[in-house]
Amino acid sequence: TLTRGVAMVTMHPIVTGGNVSEWGISPSPLSGLTFIDGVLYGTPLVNQTTPITYTIYANTSGGTTSHTLNITVNEPMFMFSYVPENQTLTRGEELYSWSPTWFNSGYPQSWSIEPALPNGLVFDNGTISGMPTVNSTRFEYIVWANNSGGSSSASINITINEPAPEMDYSPDDLILTRNTTMSVLQPTVTGGIIDTWEIEPSIPNGLSFIEGIISGTPLSIQNRSQYTIWANNSGGSMVAYINITVLDIIPEISYTPVNMTLTNDTMMSDWLPV
């Protein structure tokens, strides 16, 4: 069994008995092989995956003898790799072409990959392309290239992240009143699905921050303060800034009685607000 493009080990006949005056071979050797005086050598240039039976004849003045041998020529094993071997993709974004690089003259007859690629990605003759539709943590895949010379493999790793989130708060400058329930403040969210939310520093007493939503009734006054809000997912983080001011309650006053009649040069009683 030989390999295309690889020099074979020279085959010499073992001759006993009389001197051979003439040699013959049938059928003719494959392209790249030479048969001279019973010696077979060379570098096969074509594949022959089905064995061919050759008959070699040795002729002497006393007669002819023959010997048969079978020759198979396989394709060189295909050696390849992927550069890069690690890909970090984003759900919903196109991967145009991720193809192998090979290092020898072998040519693959078939390809396979294990396990199956995530939804949206396509594996075609060793090339990976498409638009992933699901998220995936880092996962290893084995790619196989097969031909008559055997199989070779390469490992690759694929991570698929959620698209980075985008968000906005409107209004972003809140003026609240102590002991007065605020209007719920919800962010406008686009991009990927948000996994976690954060806010710094802690919001004023009486307010709550849940899944990006600020609500509640502030219990104490405070000067204008800036807060940083993060929206996070596997694709990254988005930052927004808001300001919160908490004012004191507007006082309410009244006088009883509403009307007072005074006398000139006469001391009045204190008239105090209620």
Task: Set out the residue ranges of the language-model regions.
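Short, solvent-exposed loop/linker segments at the N-terminal edge
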Residues: T1-A7, T88-E94, L174-T181, M260-M267
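Proline-enriched interdomain boundary motifs that mark the N-terminal boundary
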Residues: T1, P76-P84, P163-P171, I249-P257
